[in-house]
Amino acid sequence: MPWSFSASRRFVLQPNHAGWVFPHQCQQRKLWDALTGDELHSFEHKHIVRACAFSEDTNLLLTGGVEKILRIFDLNRPDAPPREVDNSPSSIRTVAWLHSDQTILSSCTDIGGVRLWDVRSGKIVQTLETKSPVTSAEVSQDGRYITTADGSTVKFWDANHFGLVKSYNMPCNVESASLEPKFGNKFIAGGEDMWVHLFDFHTGEEIGCNKGHHGPVHCVRFSPGGESYASGSEDGTVRIWQTGPANNDENDTQNSGNGPTGKVKVAADEVTRKIEGFHIGKEGKSGEKDKAADA
């Protein structure tokens, strides 16, 4: 289950789940300042919340969970009652925004498919059919593709015409998948085998594999620039992996706006002390497929 960051990376939302993440706060969504770790607001719900997403303009917050209700909070008026769309066919597993915040997509915990909702009417306008429940749904940075994970399959859909573009079978049941945002030429997937797999987008060939987690991988996401990606596991750690060769030129690193893999420019200890339950694991080291297999 992913943490959700605003587009500016300034705000972060805490995911809550009654089973394994934050059982004592399973009916809330908390909003933090990602630079300081200060809690800004808490959004109360009546039951477990499983998914959240910022709108593209970061003014709206979308949540969904066991109540089968999609809620839209206005972050400029956080204490105001949210708008509700309450006709989801089952408990909500994932949510995302599409088409410049005019469309919402969601999936359910025990029903296959991804449903697309018109924000103005609150009605379903399209369904992307899958055999298994969709555990992960991501809209690509350029808005062209919707990436979904269901069962042991990763699928890519046209985000405008909603046709299936590519479908690849994975080596295990996968919980999450993410498309590289800059070039769109590779994607990552993680699941029950505790590994983070790297694949060629055009062929589906596995080109890399990362070991290090000691529990199933529940979420994977690329950084906005694609130079690294993060994985969150049931083992309680978040690991950050480098996509390509390390850049040893410190000046280039500073100009790129990205620090070394697995390290944070701000005082991580201070931020994580304030944000209960957030842990950064030891620096992840990426390996080629053949090297990982021999390990």
Model-inferred region functions:
Residues W20-F22, L61, I104-L105, I146, ...:
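Hydrophobic beta-strand positions that form the internal "hydrophobic ladder"
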Residues V12-A18, A53-T58, A96-Q102, E138-G143, ...:
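Loop/turn segments within WD40 beta-propeller blades
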Residues I48-K131, T135-A137:
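Solenoidal tandem-repeat scaffolds enriched in leucines and small polar residues
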Residues P23-C26, G64-E67, S107-I111, T148-G151, ...:
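Conserved strand-to-loop turn within each blade of WD40 beta-propeller repeats
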Residues N173, T203-C209, H214-H218, S223-S228, ...:
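Terminal intrinsically disordered, low-complexity extensions flanking WD-repeat/beta-propeller proteins
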Residues D38-H41, A80-R83, V125-Q126, V165-K166, ...:
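A structural motif specific to WD40 beta-propellers
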Residues P2-S8, F43-V49, V85-I92, L128-V134, ...:
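WD40/WD-repeat beta-propeller blade N-cap
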Residues R29-W32, C52, L70-D74, V114-D118, ...:
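WD40-repeat beta-propellers
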